[in-house]
């Protein structure tokens, strides 16, 4: 029976996770002012450095607003958030398969992959194909669910790197948590095997410069995600 590796989170990670949970649960409300960093450090029993680093990360993720000489405030993260905010919401929920997250995410990822795979069929060459074959080999050998999900993302990110422009890998990397969460949630339910044939089909289509088939292979993956979503909310 395979076991997952245990990783100890840092104090900053724990502080950020606690604050995110309090904001997302509504315990801390938009516009509410936080205690001073010194007070937060005392209440959470961590150092000022941990609190300061955590607040910086939460501000970058759109959850907090730092007003110089005035204080730190909880934001209306629907208006101030970004992909980091969405990633935090996904982690808080524990699954992509919820009514308010799944369908918009599918639409976004399908447009992203259509754009990426069409470019990859034009631009990618032998070096990229070899790298993708190695990733698929690692995917076949992977044991842990999280490893398989990470390798599935790496497959598309490596494809983006092969497109010859900074834009493709950067925008694909921005969607990393979305893509990884989709694969991780579905691999927990279906296992990794159903996703290998579409990935193999994608690589074959890239070699053939067949954008329609490459995009169609990703849509096969999306349909498997959609089946899980439908069964989740079938009642």
Region roles according to the model:
Residues 1-111:
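Short linear motifs at protein or domain termini
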Residues 10, 190-194:
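Short helix-capping and inter-helix turn/linker motifs at the boundaries of alpha-helical repeat units
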Residues 35, 40, 46, 52, ...:
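Generic alpha-helix signal with a bias toward terminal, lower-confidence helices
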Residues 108-184, 195-199, 213-228, 232:
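Conserved amphipathic alpha-helical segments that form helical-bundle/coiled-coil interaction surfaces
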């Amino acid at each position: 029976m395979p076991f997952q590796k245990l990783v100890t989170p840092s104090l900053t990670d724990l502080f950020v996770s606690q604050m995110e949970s309090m904001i997302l649960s509504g315990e801390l409300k938009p516009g509410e002012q936080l205690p001073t960093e010194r007070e937060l450090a005392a209440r959470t029993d961590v150092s000022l450095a941990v609190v300061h680093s955590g607040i910086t990360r939460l501000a970058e993720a759109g959850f907090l607003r730092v007003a110089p000489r005035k204080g730190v405030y909880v934001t209306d993260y629907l208006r101030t958030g970004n992909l980091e905010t969405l990633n935090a919401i996904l982690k808080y929920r524990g699954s992509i398969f919820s009514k308010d997250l799944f369908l918009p995410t599918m639409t976004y990822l399908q447009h992203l992959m259509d754009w990426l795979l069409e470019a990859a069929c034009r631009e990618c060459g032998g070096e990229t194909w070899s790298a993708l074959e190695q990733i698929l080999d690692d995917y076949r050998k992977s044991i842990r669910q999280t490893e398989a999900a990470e390798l599935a993302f790496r497959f598309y990110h490596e494809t983006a790197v092969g497109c010859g422009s900074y834009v493709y890998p950067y925008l694909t990397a921005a969607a990393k948590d979305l893509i990884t969460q989709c694969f991780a949630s579905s691999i927990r339910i279906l296992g990794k095997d159903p996703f290998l044939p579409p990935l193999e089909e994608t690589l074959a289509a890239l070699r053939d410069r067949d954008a329609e088939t490459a995009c169609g292979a990703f849509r096969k993956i999306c349909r498997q995600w959609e089946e899980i979503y439908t069964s989740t909310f079938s009642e």
